[in-house]
Amino acid sequence: MEYILIFISAIFVNNIVLSQFLGICPFLGVSKKVETAMGMSAAVAFVLTIATIVTFLIQKFVLDVFDLGYLQTITFILVIAGLVQMVEIILKKVSPALYQALGVFLPLITTNCCILGVAILVIQKDYDLLTGVVYAFSTALGFGLALVLFAGLREQMSLVKIPKGMQGTPIALITAGLINLSLCSLLLSI
């Protein structure tokens, strides 16, 4: 039951982008096309889940054992950077089109505060490994859901005339807020 609550909460209620405001840069930057958003979501899901496992193990079996907690942030960043490099190499071989579409945003996963934030939150909330993985994967699904919905809406908005003062970031942030309201109201209606 606890896993179901974590799953639903991380996707809908405490969405990492829409409620906790982590990962806004890729959310706004890679959300112009649904196809690109789906690719970015998959890459973030992979890196986020694997990074949570690796950082959890490093925290419990290295940093805590040797009382090196002050190295947590830099260690986690290095782990995330290594995983992103691995994803970049794999995508370049497997899907060159997606690799090109993601462009500069793929290496920027390294600095995506969503991934570092989740790795640190798992430690701060004192989750065990399985609970941490469920939380990380659910958070990745929530990030992906928000990103794909937002990309779909931005594709539709590109077809209509938007007043000059609302174009770009203003309408994007209003749309993100409406997505958050709709996800929260969906849960309230159940």
Map each language-model feature to its residues.
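Helix-coil boundary and interhelical linker segments in multi-pass alpha-helical membrane proteins
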Residues: 1-5, 57-70, 120-131, 187-190
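Structural signature of hydrophobic alpha-helical transmembrane segments
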Residues: 3-18, 67-82, 133-146
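C-terminal transmembrane helix-loop-helix hairpin of multi-pass membrane proteins
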Residues: 5, 129-190
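Hydrophobic core segments of alpha-helical transmembrane domains in multi-pass membrane transport
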Residues: 6, 13, 44, 49-53, ...
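Generic transmembrane alpha-helix signature in multi-pass membrane proteins
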Residues: 21-29, 88-93, 104-106, 113-126
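C-terminal ends of transmembrane helices
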Residues: 22-36, 84-98, 150-161
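Cytoplasmic-side transmembrane-helix entry/capping segments in multi-pass membrane proteins
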Residues: 35-46, 70-76, 98-109, 163-171
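Ordered, amphipathic secondary-structure segments that act as subunit-interaction surfaces
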Residues: 60-103
